[in-house]
């Protein structure tokens, strides 16, 4: 059985960005691992870190990340994920990024999280030996996404097995956003028809109850927003229906492309 490892900076990124591809591979008999990097609960948060939960109506005494991990567990159950892994590392607001604007600046010189990410994920990669790795492009340049993208080569992920997904909803809000400049330069689009999986993707996204208000304007807006976005993505590549558009190197194994696109 083939294995796909979906690498998510935060507890929602894979669902929002490539949940349709996840559902498609699962329906085709693949084993799916969902690995999220920044998932740690930090006791008694203050300042901007605390504001990230109180501005969503969550009281200061509540363990915000525990709520989010429960949402991730709900998504994994719905999508029949085989392996759900949390790397238990702190999000950027707990690493000195003290404002919303700071989240979208280049990594700080004193932010040494990359080494910790490699330490947590390298053994997992060796254990799972995934046939396919899906990782973010870092559209929007959120520092946590950038850190994940830039450490990927240290995990031994080969170009022939990596697909980079379009970080959503950044791709919705910033359609001209470019991938992180450290990605390989010879990437080509892989257009995955997710028309049949779109409804399931939408339901999966609504599992992230603490996030859909901020990211989409409410649970009721998730479906229309994603339907319109994925229709535009398909049309931009001369297709009908709804598509998630990934990037792959020229050396992508043809069998992997066929599993995703039937081409």
Give the predicted meaning of each segment.
Residues 70-89, 97-103, 123, 127, ...:
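The feature marks non-catalytic terminal segments
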Residues 2-158:
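Active-site beta-strand->loop->alpha-helix modules in alpha/beta enzyme cores, enriched
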